[in-house]
Amino acid sequence: MSSIKSSEVVRSTIVDTWRWMWPDILMRILPMAVIPFLYIAILHLPLAFLGLTWGDVPVQLATGLLVGICMAAFATMWRMFIVGPWFRWPTIGDHFLQGFFYLFINAPVEELFFRGLVWGAVTQWTGWIGWGWLASTAAYTLYHRLGKWSWRSVGGVGLAGLVFSLIYLAQPTPRSLLAVIIVHGFTTAGFLSWGDEVMYRRWKRGHGE
């Protein structure tokens, strides 16, 4: 890892990313993607129970992009000034690989599981949407500790989770995960990929290059 004060920059390549990505897909992404569908299949529930509806697509896209850009900036700043100065500068190919994963795989699956399944199931069991909101937000935040994220990082996740939940809660029923997924993807990419690029640019200016 490099820091703003390092004399050299450590790169992150496709090989480096793939080394952690494929076991993550097998051990985390696939189970989290399958379990929600098993739940609605067993209980004969519609896809809308999981937030799998289009909703008002133009509004969903506009909300997702506008809030997503703001959240990407927030995540980058949190990474730089709260979490710490350490970074690995991704290659162009690695940026594309990480971006694809965060936007099109990780964000949809995490939202399907937490805002879709956990929110829906707890609301169904308790009869109050507030418990669904609380359980899904808390579970989403704290599960990052399983990945050995620092508490400073988890704090940022918690704030982001509140935004994701509010976007979902504010919608008319049946709610759609589309806007939330877009915001989630931008936020994660800002924190874990684009943030590295910004930190590298700061390093470069600091070293007069």
PLM features: residue spans?
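Juxtamembrane helix-loop-helix connectors linking adjacent transmembrane helices
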Residues: S12-D24, H44-V109, W119-W125, R201-G208
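Hydrophobic alpha-helical transmembrane segments
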Residues: L26, L61-L65, F100, G130-A135, ...
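Functionally important transmembrane alpha-helices
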Residues: A33, W149-E209
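Aromatic-anchored segments of alpha-helical transmembrane domains
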Residues: F37-I40, T137-L146, L162-L166, A189-G190
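Small-polar-interrupted transmembrane alpha-helices in polytopic inner-membrane proteins
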Residues: M71-A72, L103, I129-R145, G158-G161
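C-terminal ends of transmembrane helices
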Residues: F74-R88, Y140-S150, L192-S193
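Membrane-interface helix/loop boundary segments of multi-pass membrane proteins
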Residues: P90, E110-A135, L169-R175
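Active-site His/Glu-centered metal-binding helix of metallohydrolases
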Residues: P108-F113, L117-V118, V122, L142, ...
